[in-house]
């Protein structure tokens, strides 16, 4: 395998309600107790950082695998079937008696949503689910994991360091809030770190973006990428700062956009070792995903991505530290 994605797997149900339930001032969705809320439409898809990125890597031409934990239910079958259709290796997936992860994504006003998340079998992932002798990959992509599952990630990263496997890491707000000490065993072996500004500040503190990138790189990562939703993305490799702003596109749903960008960026690094190209590939992937429901539906194949990048060219600025 070129890359093994490690992380969560879920079945997502997107539930869209009338915009009147959303208060843009308070940024809250109001649902009255005892009321019956009419739903405009429902859409089912698979999700989770592990499976989203595995499919993205496969579509971008890499030999990809998924390592995670599923239940023994219909949701697990749905996920495995889709992974096989997308040519993702699932031989390392383990099973639990706990139900497969499930999310309800409540959309109330265009791109605004609330996610109700049942972690389920994802939180059952443990070090004993890692079979080192079968993990032949050049890269590990690690999406966020919590509790005992994160302890398993620490073991995985130790294996990577001892076997010259490169690591890409995309932590969540939950992990970032734990601080640098909690993350140090992973961060010191990371090649590519991708996170958003809020997560970066939870780890480092309230600093400007370029300073965040410098401080994060001092913790171990070779390349640090900090995103800001539709705002400017900054990448830093220890010598050069790269910055770019995504194209404005019509947003349908933002779920999975972070996974799409991160996987596109990492795929770009694997293929070319060029940060500028990787940024453009990541943005192309994310810009397409947010134009459709579901975290995987609009993930691009490599040919589609290159065509999109030529048509919607993004300027990447460079500056030396």
Each model region followed by its residue ranges:
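Beta-strand->loop->alpha-helix junctions that form or flank phosphate-binding loops
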Residues: 68-72, 91-99, 224-228
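Conserved phosphate-binding/catalytic region of the ribokinase-like
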Residues: 3-4, 13-17, 176, 210-321
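Glycine-rich phosphate/adenosyl-contacting loop at the front of the ribokinase-like
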Residues: 1-67, 77-78
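Hydrophobic beta-strand scaffold residues
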Residues: 64, 90, 167-168
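Alpha-helix C-terminal capping segments
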Residues: 54-63, 107-108, 268-272
